[in-house]
UniProtKB/Swiss-Prot annotation:
Stored InterPro entries: CAF1B_HIR1_beta-prop (IPR055410), HIR1-like (IPR031120), HIRA-like_C (IPR011494), HIRA_B_motif (IPR019015), WD40/YVTN_repeat-like_dom_sf (IPR015943), WD40_repeat_CS (IPR019775), WD40_repeat_dom_sf (IPR036322), WD40_rpt (IPR001680)
One Pfam family from the record: Hira
Organism of provenance: Candida albicans (strain SC5314 / ATCC MYA-2876)
Protein name as catalogued: Protein HIR1
Organismal lineage: Eukaryota, Fungi, Dikarya, Ascomycota, Saccharomycotina
PANTHER family associated with the record: MEMBER OF THE HIR1 FAMILY OF WD-REPEAT PROTEINS, PROTEIN HIRA
Functional summary from the UniProt entry: Required for replication-independent chromatin assembly and for the periodic repression of histone gene transcription during the cell cycle.
Protein family according to the UniProt entry: Belongs to the WD repeat HIR1 family.
Keyword set, alphabetical order: Chromatin regulator, Nucleus, Repeat, Repressor, Transcription, Transcription regulation, WD repeat
SMART domains in alphabetical order: WD40
GO terms for biological process, alphabetical: chromatin remodeling; chromosome segregation; hyphal growth; mitotic sister chromatid segregation; negative regulation of chromatin organization; negative regulation of transcription by RNA polymerase II; negative regulation of transcription by RNA polymerase III; nucleosome assembly
Subcellular location(s) of the protein: Nucleus
Repeat region (WD), residues: 15-54, 89-128, 147-186, 189-228, 292-346, 350-391
Top-rank taxon: Eukaryota
Amino acid sequence: MQILKIPWFGHKTENKTVECYAVTINKDGTRLASGGLDGNVKIWDLTTINVFYKMADQPHKSKKDSTSTKLEESLPDKSLRRPLCSMSRHNGVVTSLKFSPDGRWLASGSDDKICLIWEKDNTQIAKSFGTDEHDLEHWTVRKRLVAHDNDIQDICWSPDGNLLVTVGLDRSVIIWNALTFEKIKRYDIHQSMVKGIVFDPANKFFATASDDRTVRIFRYYKKLNEYNNYEFQMEHVVVDPFKKSPLTSYFRRMSWSPDGQHIAVPNATNGPVPSVAIINRGNWGSDISLIGHEAPVEVCSFSPTLFQIADTPANEEIKFQTVVATGGQDRTLAIWSTCNSRPIVVCSDIVDSSITDICWSPDGETLYFSCLDGSITGVKFGARELGQPVKEDLIDQQLNRYGADRESTILPESVEQLQLEEQSKDSRAISIRRMMPIQEAKPEQTPPISTPASAAIDIERLRKQTVTMTKSGKKRVAPLLVSTSAAPKNVLQKPLEKKRRTKSSSKISQAAYLLPKMGVQTTVHGIKKKAESMSNDTEVEENNDNDDIGENVMANTNSVSDAALKRQRNRRKRKLMELKYPSSFKYISNLPEGLFNNHTLQNIEINKIYKAHSKHKDISAEISSSTAVEIDEDLVFSVVFRVFDHMRKENEVLGQTSGRIRTTIEVRNGKPWDDDISDRDFDDATKVIVTEEGNDKREYCLFFPFRVQHVLPIILNDVLKYYVLCSFHGSVQIISADTGSYRCPTFELGESVVTMRHSQGYMLVLTSSGLFYSWDLKAMKVTMTGISIAAILNNYEIGGKIVVSPIVRGLEINPQDGSPLVLLDMTNDIYGYSIDLQCWVKTVDSWYYGVGADKDLDVVLTGLVKKSKMSYEEDKVTEKIFTYKFDSSNDLEDAMRKRGQELLDLI
């Protein structure tokens, strides 16, 4: 193995090196293109570079030695020790470069959001004014592809050269027609920046890698009887190896093995260790990881050649191996083989900065890689050092197992299916001959001349054409054969026609573009087919084709769209949120009010408004499902913050003086933990930080294995005693405020808590299902457990298909025994729970407000009575309730006043 570093082989500006981001080699192995921070695309002559390998083969000798002198004389002239040309048409950093499979085109992507298509121009170009040396070659821009909204990170051509895919930081995957360079599709299905793209050498799939920690496998194939018109489907999403992959890498450049069996994906993790994930074709499993790098891996690249394993026994089938090179932020180049569990060679600190791109020569024995230090380094392996290279015919045989030689829309599910299809051709023909009796040949009869009646029959058939609905909601008319013959139809053709019709209706997408009227331009947005205008449905066109992509081939039979699945998920999520945060408790909880919104009620009201102002009778499901604002629970409670004032006692040991201080509790919730223990990290624990005003140091910092939603300080006689922490699933933990130690074991309520109250040493908790729990914290005893509020919420109003429950307007805790006091919005009555009677009692009846019954009550009950009276007066003004009008005599009014006063005396 030889490592070649040439001082002038790289990117420099004014004797200063600049970052180099991309390298690529053409199919002949004669040209290498590089791009970097200087915005230039440089073309290098590999014939000139390879001469230096020959000089490295010879042993080092003195300068006076004649052999060394001859070698130096055989080196290329100093005027050739530079790039053949340097093109500066980009307005930003060149981040990606790829030669087309035939070597004619060179695609370059940049952070100026533009992809340029270059072609070599053989015409002689005069020397530019102000330049010392003119370019030895001239490359010109043929197309400018404009569609991205942010930096282009990677580019890849399909193996047949008919497709070009670009990905970028705008999370878009844009597919171009590589013949006309029109935009075919744009998919924005990734949730974050897309940093890698690779095509299957069998020309059936391509894969994309994104910062959303997923690798998506796309299947594509040509449509039936349509030239260069493709169908795209989502095949699989790989998640497991990338759950904890870092987001610090600039690239995620993948590579597909030349035999089509494996995908090498960088920036994966195996536990806490950086790794390279190997994805198997077919089941898309990712059980294999290449572990050896000490920092995230940026790029992987398979050698384009298969190598024969030398020690294969003679009586066994010849085995092959593939070789992959990996590099990343640890400045290390590693060469791996599929027949070894350890790397063939590891070159540590081979460069001074991160490795950004790797490319192999067509013979598979020389590689070049770029680096952020601006250099381009070459590595050449000796003859048979990696193994015996196999012929291209054997590689084609390996790819033909996956249908590389087929362009049919009938998709093979496995290699065995392709073999069975070949075997079944002859058997199918034999079985048909056995079923059909041998008949003597008869002279052909002249077909009868069609009559006008047959035309009438055809018109009736045309009127009964089959109309199908695609996933995007568009209507399509199935084509019918218009025959001018009056001969009867063949009965045997009916099942075939039905099968074809079903198959054509399962298509997910159709061509969304035609050739533009003004010719093929740089950027083609396409023109919708005029046949779609026949539909009466108005559609809002988006700048992507996400609705046209399918999940997989088997899912086409179900015809379930992504939008429908998304609506189902949102519907289930809303139901869970309504169960977890009932709208009846939104006024008594200190949680954000948006969590308690009843989405069903909101949608019904919005539907009424929409139908009143719209000409359409039916409201679309998309509008109905998107009316309610969704709240991310994890984002809302990522930090829980409480600040409160209290008295602090004097402590001579700690040097604390008595006085009024302010304490802050900050809860930093970790990520939701998975059920799988192996996926849990200590870094994901919830952190509780307690600080005091005026004290630079923290009082203490606690860690919990659950995510905290509620924080309740317990203050007795103006002195802070305890902190009460409650999780999302009803785990209640009481902590001593002085030391941070546990006061008691964790309470498990089994469901989320809506609100918490405390008074005079009592703590009251209300859960999402309406159950009350109360404890005496002084004696550490329970006062009431699992008391349901349903007894006083049994009044409900039915409106259409929904049930409107009464809203709890106020909630307080009785300081005498810790029982709840509840104010209802519908009746304005105040209820309390009697621990002695073990039932709910009506503490204050709003019916007696009309006669002015009054009494001096305690502070807690007085506040609820004021709220009740204000709501009562508001209902009178809005005529929700009607008060009784007394006669001229005051006997009835006096009797009611006495009865109301009697009820108040019982409190």
